[in-house]
A protein has these predicted regions:
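Extended, folded domain segments that form the structural surfaces/walls around functional sites
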Residues: 7-36
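Charged (often Lys/Glu-rich) extended helix/loop segments that serve as interaction or gating elements
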Residues: 24, 33-175
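Glycine-rich beta-strand-to-loop/alpha-helix junction loops that act as flexible
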Residues: 1-9, 40-42
Length: 175
């Protein structure tokens, strides 16, 4: 079984009820005497990853602002691939709210190089850091070198210890 044990990608979604789910599975196993194999995927590692991106440019289009990040669809394919939602936060909090909606996009010239559009978000400026949450499942495993973009560094953080578990690629690594 897989696909049913997701994670909550927004504050609006309810947390998965493992007790209710396991109770139904146990009942089914006892009745039908079958073996069930689980693929829990996202429920185990989905919330263990965060993509941190820097704002490289802000483009005001009149009705909204495009927040262009140094991360792109090659770093996190889920929004481009199937419109997946990932909670997005400013790393440094501010109480000033933008008067215009923000569309968070990557620097690749593709219409699908888009992470999220938010109607209400704090004021941002170039070089601010943005955290795109819950990318532990299918974040790095779906990443690619599309458009000759090097893959980003991957860090493991445990308490106050930080360890590089994958070095940032360089363009020479791609050739």
């Amino acid at each position: 079984l897989g696909g049913g044990m997701g994670i909550s990608y927004s504050d609006k979604n309810k947390k998965f009820n493992y007790k209710k789910y396991s109770s139904a599975i146990v009942k089914f196993i006892r009745k039908h005497k079958v073996k069930i194999i689980f693929e829990p995927g996202r429920s185990i590692i989905g919330d263990t990853g965060t993509l941190v991106a820097k704002i490289i440019y802000i483009k005001d289009s009149g009705s909204k602002k495009f927040i262009i990040l140094d991360a792109a669809m090659n770093d996190l394919m889920r929004p481009a691939l199937y419109g997946a939602f990932h909670k997005t936060l400013a790393v440094i909090k501010s109480n000033k709210i933008s008067k215009k909606p923000y569309e968070f996009v990557g620097p690749i010239c593709e219409s699908t190089d888009k992470f999220i559009t938010l109607k209400k978000f704090q004021e941002l400026k170039e070089k601010d850091l943005i955290a795109i949450c819950d990318v532990g499942a299918y974040g790095m495993s779906l990443s690619s070198n599309y458009n000759l973009r090097p893959k980003s560094v991957e860090l493991l953080i445990k308490g106050s210890k930080i360890k590089v578990i994958r070095k940032r690629q360089k363009h020479k690594d791609l050739i």
